[in-house]
A protein has these predicted regions:
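Periplasmic/extracellular, small/polar-rich flexible segments of pilin-like filament-forming proteins
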Residues: 43-154
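Amphipathic alpha-helical segments typified by the pilin-like N-terminal helix
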Residues: 1-39
Length: 154
């Protein structure tokens, strides 16, 4: 086998096996891109934005990437959903959320398991419900250590 063939085989194989964690990093980056708009809305209005439009960001289906299907803002919670195909099987259709809570006149952001906030005027979040009682959360083994918060995070 020539050097070229070895390099070609290596590239061909490695392209197929992009680790789930690398794919999840795209979701985190896209979700984090919405944080400043959500924070600004809260600081100006005293409540969390109800949706992407009120936050002043693109529609959920327009915030997407190679592995991410959509990024939704709902009552200040930013949730990224992975695509149902073309991604690592362990994260297909799974979600992660970023959310903030008020802290001394500012906001503190959290990242981790998917959550929901029922009231835009409240900081309380709960674990998101999903199919069959599962919340479609990305397994923590695929999340960086800085993005493993749960709804009870303080």
């Amino acid at each position: 086998m020539s050097d070229f063939q070895i390099i070609f085989e290596y590239c061909r194989c490695s392209k197929v096996r992009i680790p789930a964690r690398a794919q999840v990093s795209e979701a985190i980056l896209l979700a984090e891109g919405q944080k400043s708009a959500v924070t600004e809305y809260y600081l100006n209005n005293g409540e969390w934005p109800e949706n992407n439009t009120s936050a002043g960001v693109a529609s959920a289906s327009d915030i997407k990437g190679k592995y991410v299907e959509s990024v939704t803002v709902a009552n200040g919670v930013v949730t990224a959903k992975m695509k149902p195909s073309g991604v690592n099987k362990e994260i297909q259709g799974k979600k992660l959320s970023l959310w903030a809570k008020r802290e001394n006149g500012s906001v503190k952001w959290f990242c981790g398991q998917p959550v929901t906030r029922n009231d835009a005027k409240d900081d309380t979040v709960t674990a998101a419900a999903g199919n069959g009682g599962k919340n479609n959360a990305i397994d923590t083994k695929h999340l960086p250590s800085t993005c493993r918060d749960t709804s009870s995070a303080e």
